[in-house]
């Protein structure tokens, strides 16, 4: 589902139904920041119920980890929320029944499988805010049923997005100052952490220093990026949530799930360096309350296709439309990241034009596998496919 469409509520309902059935639940998030946020929200959601909830992350002290391990093994913990720490060998569950994975494409298949194997007959719900077209979803997750939330929460306003050619904030600096003076908070997104001689791009460190100096004595500026330790990231995010920091300069580490309703303005430097779906994810961090959100895209790109793509974002804010456009102009590897997509380049097929064929083929494939294991049919064909796959072929002729 799209950014802010209510996926977490769907997960919460599933986790509660699982709890009522007497099973333990687990929710896995890709970052400690997001895991902590889920923990805080769900603890509040379930506070009226007799439900024991724990947060398990890699940065916990050994003593705290052991207490959680014991609670999971004895069954005194009903729901655990965490990062990859949830599927380590040292973690044992008494009766795990339901697993939720947030941001599906950020975890490897082996990681998801390891968590699912922590119990018998575990139900599995995976969620992603990258609203990929159904055809691509079926190709990536062909062994799962795919559901889409295509509506927005009532009353949520569209993000107003404006693209500026250049790398200066001057065109909207007055608006930014006025917004901050009214108590608002702002994200400033950069493609790099540090300056790179080979890449003439704005770095988070450089922009952080410039903004700290410019707004000194008026507003507090914070810095967030992937190279910080988890404790440092959590501290910066908490300060931003508590409005101790008014301007947060960051890389795309804030792309996933961060929720600060008071932050309703975002500036993205070198916007041409990001995929459209990635920018859509980023701007989904703002406008989460009842206030109007503003996103300013800065780019010095001179090529027309790049300009056209950024202008497209000014006019469109439906995540499914954007991802479809992104997929057509950049390809599936770019949409999800080459390492995550796991989708081979089709030698002949077209993921849009051949949707009906893809769905029909999927139905036949499921039937063939079922008949193979139940009746021994299609044995030669299945064995031939197994050999082809082992050789690493991207297609079968």
Label the predicted regions:
Residues 1-311, 397:
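Inter-lobe coupling/hinge segments of SF2-like helicase ATPases
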